[in-house]
Structures are given as structure tokens and as C-alpha cells.
Amino acid sequence: MTAQGQTLSGDTTLVLPEFDTPPEDPLALMRDWLDSAVAREIREPLAAVLATVDTSGRVSSRVLLVKEADARGLLFTSFQGSRKGRDLAASPTASLTFYWRETLQQLTVQGPVEVLDAGASDDLFARRPLEAQATTAVSRQSRTLDDEAELKARARALVEAGDPVSRPAEWTGYRLVPDAVEFWYGSPDRLHRRLRYDRPAETGSWSHRRLQP
């Protein structure tokens, strides 16, 4: 099969009335799309590409797991000293994009990013499996790795000890507060359906418009 034959190969039969009758609240629709992706057993439904920018305007992106999505925004975690953490400290705005190949849906959320307080970050850390907590405790994300075996051994020792693992002070939660949301549904004929919402800071109110493919 050619690469061309593998593109836009998902479900083209979804009924998505929001494109014809857009609701006023894009965040409720955002949660509906996320819940539907989970219900349809999409692979990695909460995996998203986070794009950040540094002070020189250089963009970087990476796939991560979104922990929660509600009316206040989207939660994710990172080390403050990582590339994304440094970017967000200097330019606290970002974009998260979900793509679900099985259903030909893409959801993009943009907006300012705020750092969660210690209590909220502790709660997020406590939800992680012990193995993930141990790796987080011994790692300094994005720093130079000199000895992989030694790093793994330190993480394994924490797991085997079975004691509670404390959240590293540098590991924190973030919330992306949406001020723009775009819903996209792909079509093999490239007549993709697009619905964009914007919430300007001056008004604080959502507006929406359909976009050409």
C-alpha cells in the first residue's frame, strides 16, 4: 500500500451536527469529543502534540498525555527545567493538538498556560503508577544523560523499596486555558469540515465561524 493510500483512512460516516449548528460553548463540545474518543476506544485518545515557543521565536513540539480536560482548561505535567518548561516560563502560551486517525478527527486548543500550585501538582503526581513516580524522581528531564544503566538502577531501587515517592519540586502541573479551539473532521476528497472558536481577551466571549478546507 502506498503512503497516499494510508492517508485519511478513518471513519467517514460520523454524524457531527456541530458543524451545521455550532453550539455556543466550545469547551463543552471539546469535552464531548474527548469523551467520544475514549468511548470509541481510540488508541491513545488523550495523547496530544504540545507546541511551545522560546524567546527567539523557535517552536518546539512533542507528544504528551493530557491528564484532565474541563471548563477551566487542559492539564498536563512536566519538569520546569525541560525544554517545554523553559519555553513556558519565557512565553506562557501553547497549542495542544489531538489527532484520532480512526475517526478522522482533529482537535486543536490554544491559549495561555498557567502553572498549578503545589497541592494540585502533588495530586497529579500521586495518580502516577509507582514506576512512573520513581522514574520522575530520579530523572531531570531533558538534561544530558551520562549513564542510562545507573539511572535505571536508581529508579528500580525506589520501586523495590516500596516507600512513598515524593514529587520532585521541579515537576509540576500546567493548565492550558483555551482562548481558541478548532474542530476538524477529515474527508478523503479534502473537503474537510472545520469549525473555529475564538475568545478575545477584550470581550471574554466566544465567537465561532466555519473555515474553508
Give residue spans per PLM region.
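Binding-site signature for planar aromatic cofactors or substrates
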Residues: 1-213
